[in-house]
Amino acid sequence: MSRPLSELHVAVLMGGLSSEREVSLTSGKGCADALEGQAAKVSRIDAGRDLAAVLTALKPDVVLNCLHGEWGEDGCVQGVLETLQIPYTHSGVLASALAMDKHKSKAVLKAAGVVVPGGGLFDRREVARRHVIPPPYVIKPNAEGSSVGVYLVRDGANTPITEVGDPSWTYGELVMVEPFIPGKELCVAVIGEATGPRALTVTDITPTKGFYDYEAKYAPGGSVHELPAKLPAHVFEKALRQAELAHTAMGCRGVSRSDFRYDDVNDELVFLEVNTQPGMTPTSLVPEQAAYVGMSYQDLVRWIVEDASCPR
């Protein structure tokens, strides 16, 4: 977008229909507040299935998509925005859909030269009955984010996680099962500039309760972030380059965040996933990395909006 924020009507999408609704509401509020502080006209939209009608009536100049998870992050809302021909932020239909499918995105990234973990895709009921791979391993829904529905099966466990087979399970019939990689939890934010993707820095994340789950990500004090991460120089550099490679290989636009595990005993860096709609909450990793390189929260939100386009 070439016009200044003060001349723009920005619709901020938040909330939505997924299990990550509360995180999205917090992200959306932060972004909307930042835009209003820069004189933009802002419409805050708790996005539902009537979104197309709401946007048609509002006629915004641009949509800032702060939705997370199913429907808002998987290509569905992006398709609505493409159909309405409204400039919007973050990745387009294909990259969004691909990144939300962990199994398919791993195949694309592996082909591009990104080091990904082993394991595979399994029926959740089979995973609930037996160990499909030797412990320790991680079970995660194939199409969820924010560590929703993620379980760690520790070494020596006699039985797998039975919750995965329960009728109340709402995260899809197929789950990813991957070997647990000991060591450090790392992430890298990437900004897709005109000259190519630029990785910001590497954050080392230490959960206060031992496992980086939903609570550790979003609860105050749930994790400790160290940036830049204290890593061997070659590992730090590799994380930056692998994150940029993932951004490009997946066709991401705007901002993305890549997550890694680093086994510091075996000196092995393994890519976990790319997030096309990273959180923008007070404890989120991307705003933190942006601040480290001199970009304030307000600057980051402005850049994201200025990067909007249609088609993506």
PLM-predicted stretches and their roles:
Residues 1-94, 98-100, 104, 111, ...:
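ATP-binding N-terminal substructure of ATP-dependent carboxylate-amine bond-forming enzymes
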Residues 1-14, 55-57, 98-183, 194:
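Active-site nucleotide/adenylate-binding loops and adjacent lid/helix of ATP-dependent enzymes
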Residues 78-82, 212-219, 276:
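Short, flexible, mixed-charge acidic loops at enzyme active sites
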Residues 158-241, 269-270:
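Phosphate-binding site of ATP-dependent enzymes
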Residues 179, 247-280, 290:
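Conserved metal-phosphate-binding beta-hairpin within the catalytic cores
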Residues 268-312:
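C-terminal active-site "lid" helix and adjoining low-complexity regulatory extension at the edge
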